Amino acid sequence: MLKVKNVTLRFGGLVANNDVSMEVRDGKITGLIGPNGAGKTTFFNCISGVYTPNEGKIIFEGKEIQGYRPYQINKAGISRTYQIINLFKKMKVYENVIVGMHSRLNSSVTDSLFKTKKEREEEKKAYEKALELLDFVGLLELKDEPAGSLPYGKQRLLEICRALASDPKILLLDEPAAGMNATEKNELDVLCKKIVERGVSILIIEHDMKLMMGLADYMYVLNYGKLLAEGAPFEIQNNPAVIEAYLGGE
């Protein structure tokens, strides 16, 4: 579904991603781990169009997308969340979800300005879809609350909900469990598996190794911008190089 081939990204003399190749398989949860500064979020930024790699290819559904802008990547079917929560905190919860639908809405400026029948029908459908997604992630009862009033873990779930609003085929999750307690992490685990059941593949960056080992079908490890290892979770967990670089060797 998504293939990244030999991607290199440089910032002057700094090589942030160095000849990185990986694949996100259809219907699977793919994990990406590595120590702080390994280049994981930078890699997400290459996939999502924030950065254009200096070398290599990013192929989504058979089409090269490196060089696409973020809105084009989103429209193509790749959505993401961020390390730092990026909600419109004064807007209602359901309104934040509707914002995530922007790449799928069809109303013109004229429709919006004059509130045409088409615009009213689209607003109704967007609202109904927002409620369905909020119910899916367990936030329906909070739909009318200001997003900023939600507990931190719930804000994380709202970000995922908003990312789902664009009907992605692949969802990039950047440390979604950060700041969550044990109960919330269990809920996140269940939610990710439900998302895959909806037909959305996931590429996830996460530092919680216990969560990742039970969640990912396949994993990649970055270290100093280079691919250190790949394999099934149990293989990664027992890989001496990974233990030394990330899990903490003796």
Stretches with model-predicted labels:
Residues 1-250:
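Glycine-rich phosphate-binding loops of nucleotide-dependent enzymes
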